[in-house]
Amino acid sequence: MKNIAIITGASSGIGKEFLLNMPKNIEVDEIWAIAREKNFFEGLKEESNLNIRPFSLDLEKETSLMKIKDLLEEEKPNIKLLINAAGFGKFEKSTNISLEDSVGMIKVNDMALTSLCLMAIPYMKKNSNIINIASVAAFQPVPYINVYAASKAYVLSFSRSLGKELSKEGIHVLTVCPFWTKTKFFDRAVEKNKVIKKYVVMYDPTDVVEKAYIDMQKKKSVSVYGFIANVQRVLCKLLPHNFVMSIWCKQQKLK
């Protein structure tokens, strides 16, 4: 039985950093790297000597998820690490975002993530790990990032509950909640009119991933990198959400 890791969103950003910086104590025979982009593997080969098995799959489509399910049933690997880093957002007034994009966010950010967790768990043993990528937006409702923030709140709640359920089996679940991070995420998220205008700080994905792996080894349930991000996390616990939303809208000069 071969040991594998599965990483979605592996072609760029946080997902790619998770792949390239995987701790040496996680010994796997193969990394299943999943990304929507075609031919993304060529770039990864130049940056890594890991045994990467690439899959060009759009996780918004159920057929893509079924391909993974069928492959797991066929090969029956031992999954030592699952990282759900695929996802996208749209920054705009909710009624100005296409229905296709709004539903697509839920399909990729939530449905695909949930499906992959439930598919993978039967092939995981004690000391295996699941890392799900949420966002600091998961801690509060965020106008003009409405569906995205709600989808990440789901990821946080689902992951923490799942971690509790799996703890007796020795399977650990970590939720990573990044603040603004320098990735290609914004190429798709930001519309031409740029509703979101102010980014307090922009973190490097390598730092986010480094802390996440450290927190995984420490068996933490949530990983938040950066002083400002952690301040926001605390304030969202202490302050009424109506007040937090008002501050956000004022900061972005939104009505």
Which sequence ranges carry the predicted segments?
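C-terminal helical subdomain
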Residues: 175, 196-233
